């Protein structure tokens, strides 16, 4: 065990890391006349063609953020990992919403995936799933593949500007890690903590990995003294589990499950003077932003010298509940008076992505590598953002009426 102390410009962090691994040693005999040659292998990329090929052979502009780079830069989230990427800009707009841009594009034209799988996210026309730059953590990540430029032929219109594909680790040995981080804001106040446990193992033909965390951040108060909370704060609980089986012929079957749960809030205050020195009111507004996403997948794949193929079914379910609540209290002569609690405004979203896909890649001669595949995707959304205003829902009056809509996508593609 060792202790690391890291300093940042905006906050200080104290980090404990405990790593355990199993190692296999074998005897080595050295000879004076033996000559050792070293080779640097060209990095491999999957996202550009949906099958593994070298970066040099890729038809797209590709950048890989390797595990070594992630470690050197101490990247904790996908936002951190993308800071050094060429042509990629991650920023927050005036409403605090995350945005991702590739070569100046809008966020809705950048597709973010994990292991080639889409993620259910906000029903937001502008930001799409850009919020995931802060949700996706790097403890279980092998590399991040970035495609700069249109990839609509393989991934659809939401990849018009490019693709960011997070590739997670494949268990190769028994290992694990425990991480804990506590941070402080510039003003010396506690910013909260982040904790994570990662385990992986291999037993004969079976492999597994478990990644679980608990994060709790605290509010950053307005330095001007208004009493406003400048950030959303609260708890975040991510967990993922993957189990795989490798058959004797080399084919692999894997099942994956992941869930992230967020309970966040943010408050602001305002004072309205009715009669100076005599009557005024204090208004406290609180926003509750609670999110949960659950992902399931089942994958069967295989490869040999001639071809590589995969068949996969997966589902991503995103639940959101956004509530705003106003509480007003009157003061007369400095004495507290009537408290008025308004009905909360509630916005709810449930989005379900269901996908069945498969593709096969094979060599045709010495110069051609053909990939052919198909994808069926159903994007079903329900909530308060789909109809006219005014219809009440449980707990208060919604911004919009509750309704449901679905879009079905079917794609067939061939690429050389």
Predicted ranges, named:
Residues 2-73, 80-85, 200, 237, ...:
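N-terminal Sec signal peptide and the immediately downstream disordered periplasmic leader
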Residues 42, 98, 162, 176, ...:
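Hydrophobic, lipid-facing positions within transmembrane beta-strands of outer-membrane proteins
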Residues 49, 149, 179-185, 213-217, ...:
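Outer-membrane beta-barrel pore domains and translocons
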Residues 78-81, 98-101, 112-113, 131-134, ...:
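N-terminal periplasmic accessory domains that precede
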Residues 79-118:
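Extracytoplasmic beta-strand/coil segments of soluble accessory domains associated
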Residues 101, 118-148:
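Short acidic/polar hinge/loop motifs at secondary-structure boundaries
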Residues 173-187, 194-288:
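Periplasmic-side early beta-strands and strand-to-turn transitions of outer-membrane beta-barrels
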Residues 246-260, 287-416:
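Face-selective signature of the C-terminal outer-membrane beta-barrel domain
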């Amino acid at each position: 065990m060792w202790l690391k102390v890291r300093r940042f410009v905006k906050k200080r962090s104290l980090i404990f890391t405990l790593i355990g691994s199993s190692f296999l040693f074998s005897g080595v005999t050295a000879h004076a006349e033996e000559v050792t040659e070293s080779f640097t292998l060209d990095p491999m990329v999957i996202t550009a063609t949906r099958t593994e090929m070298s970066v040099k052979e890729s038809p797209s502009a590709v950048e890989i953020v390797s595990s070594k780079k992630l470690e050197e830069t101490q990247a904790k989230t996908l936002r951190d990992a993308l800071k050094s990427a060429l042509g990629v800009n991650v920023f927050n707009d005036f409403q605090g919403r995350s945005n991702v841009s590739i070569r100046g594009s809008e966020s809705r034209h950048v597709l973010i995936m994990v292991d080639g799988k889409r993620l259910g996210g906000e029903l937001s026309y502008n930001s799409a799933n850009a919020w995931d730059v802060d949700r996706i953590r790097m403890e279980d990540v092998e590399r991040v593949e970035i495609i700069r430029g249109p990839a609509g032929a393989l991934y659809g219109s939401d990849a018009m500007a490019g693709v960011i594909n997070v590739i997670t680790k494949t268990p190769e040995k028994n290992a694990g890690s425990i991480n804990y981080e506590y941070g402080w804001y510039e003003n010396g106040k506690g910013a909260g903590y982040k904790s994570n446990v990662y385990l992986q193992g291999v037993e004969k033909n079976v492999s597994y990995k478990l990644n679980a965390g608990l994060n709790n951040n605290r509010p950053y108060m307005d330095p001007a003294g208004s009493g406003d909370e400048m950030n959303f704060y609260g708890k975040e609980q991510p967990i993922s589990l993957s189990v795989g089986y490798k058959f004797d012929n080399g084919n692999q079957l894997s099942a994956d499950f992941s869930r992230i749960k967020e309970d966040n809030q943010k408050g602001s205050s305002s004072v309205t003077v009715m009669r100076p020195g005599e009557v005024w009111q204090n208004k406290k507004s609180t926003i509750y932003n609670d999110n949960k996403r659950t992902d399931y997948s089942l994958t069967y794949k295989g490869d040999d010298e001639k071809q590589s193929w995969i068949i996969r079914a997966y589902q991503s379910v995103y639940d959101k509940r956004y509530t705003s609540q106003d509480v007003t209290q009157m003061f007369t002569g400095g004495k507290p008076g009537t408290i008025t609690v308004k009905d909360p405004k509630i916005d709810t979203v449930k989005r379900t992505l269901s996908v069945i896909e498969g593709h096969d890649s094979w060599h045709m001669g010495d110069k051609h590598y053909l990939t052919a595949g198909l994808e069926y995707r159903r994007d079903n959304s329900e909530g308060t953002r789909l109809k006219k205003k005014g219809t009440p829902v449980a707990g208060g009056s919604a911004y919009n009426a509750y309704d449901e809509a679905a879009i079905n996508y079917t794609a067939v593609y061939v690429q050389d």
